[in-house]
From Swiss-Prot:
Binding site for Ca(2+) 2: 145
One biological process term in Gene Ontology: fatty acid biosynthetic process
Enzyme type, top EC level: oxidoreductase
Record-listed substrate binding positions: 138
Entry protein name: 3-oxoacyl-[acyl-carrier-protein] reductase FabG
SUBUNIT field: Homotetramer.
Binding of Ca(2+) 1, residues: 50, 53
Catalytic function, reaction form: a (3R)-hydroxyacyl-[ACP] + NADP(+) = a 3-oxoacyl-[ACP] + NADPH + H(+)
InterPro entries (UniProt xref): 3oxo_ACP_reduc, NAD(P)-bd_dom_sf, Sc_DH/Rdtase_CS, SDR, SDR_fam
Top-level taxon of the source organism: Bacteria
Name of the encoding gene: fabG
Protein residues bound to Ca(2+) 3: 234
Highest classification ranks of the organism: Bacteria, Pseudomonadati, Pseudomonadota, Gammaproteobacteria, Enterobacterales
Matching SUPFAM superfamilies: NAD(P)-binding Rossmann-fold domains
Length: 244
């Protein structure tokens, strides 16, 4: 890796939206450090990065692991100019049936990990007086959804976190924003039967699912110099499914 090039750190870069973001960043000349929860995922990251960065295994529920991995990156003289919190999980269940572990796992992965990752990189960004912090949220944070009180709480928590953080670091040249996708075409949507497909589609004014590349484009914009005066904002990418 070239220490003179900008570097983006992306969680969950082995597939889906994370991979789409990483590939677009590479085209912009930005190096990528990507994470996955498995060695197989890391191999996939390294294959598509083609030398424009590297991947490594990271368990977002392990606080010590997050801190250690970030410190290792800095010790190797790599910078983290752009932090993209993309990884997230769902463990859906109605509240009356939800186990404590289902609540804890989702909150730790989707919300607490963002706190620990930001805390690990923020001092370096402040010292350089520049940085981008971008997190993938969800339309569910605004609309709610049956069976997802844990997921909704985790994504809603990110909104308040990012607004408060944006106020704390705005004078330091650091922007803090969220990209909030609606229904995006994934392996999940491809498994829907025609009735389920039409039910989901009926909630989207644009009458189609979003593409992961469209979410990635929003992230690329917020990471660019063109978005240098935007902070504490949530950029919705949902085809009109939710409007402020």
């Amino acid at each position: 890796m070239n220490i003179n090039r900008q570097t983006a750190f992306i969680t969950g870069a082995n597939q889906g939206i994370g991979k789409a973001i990483a590939k677009k960043l590479i085209k912009k000349g930005i190096q990528v450090i990507g994470t996955s929860t498995t060695e197989d995922g890391v191999k996939r990251i390294n294959d598509y990065l083609e030398g424009n960065g590297f991947g490594f295994v990271l368990n977002l529920k392990n606080i010590d692991s997050i801190t250690e991995k970030i410190q290792e990156i800095y010790k190797k003289k790599h910078s983290i100019d752009i932090l993209i919190n993309n990884a997230g999980i769902k463990e859906d269940n109605l509240l009356v049936n939800m186990k404590s572990t289902e609540w804890d796992d989702v909150i730790k992965t989707n919300l607490s990990s963002v706190f620990h990752l930001v805390k690990s990189v923020i001092r370096s960004m402040i010292k350089k007086r520049q940085g981008r912090i971008i997190t993938i949220g969800s339309v569910i944070a605004y609309t709610g959804n049956k069976g997802q009180v844990n997921y909704s709480a985790s994504k809603s928590g990110l909104i308040g976190f990012h607004k408060s953080l944006a106020l704390e670091v705005a004078s330091k040249g650091i922007t803090v924003n969220i990209v909030s996708p609606g229904l995006i075409k994934t392996n999940f949507t491809e498994k829907l039967n025609s009735i389920q497909y039409q039910k989901y589609l009926s909630n989207i004014p644009m009458k189609r699912f979003g593409q992961k590349e469209e979410v990635a484009d929003a992230v690329i914009f917020l990471a660019s110099k063109k978005a240098s005066y935007i902070t504490g904002h949530t950029l919705h990418v949902n085809g009109g499914m939710y409007m402020i």
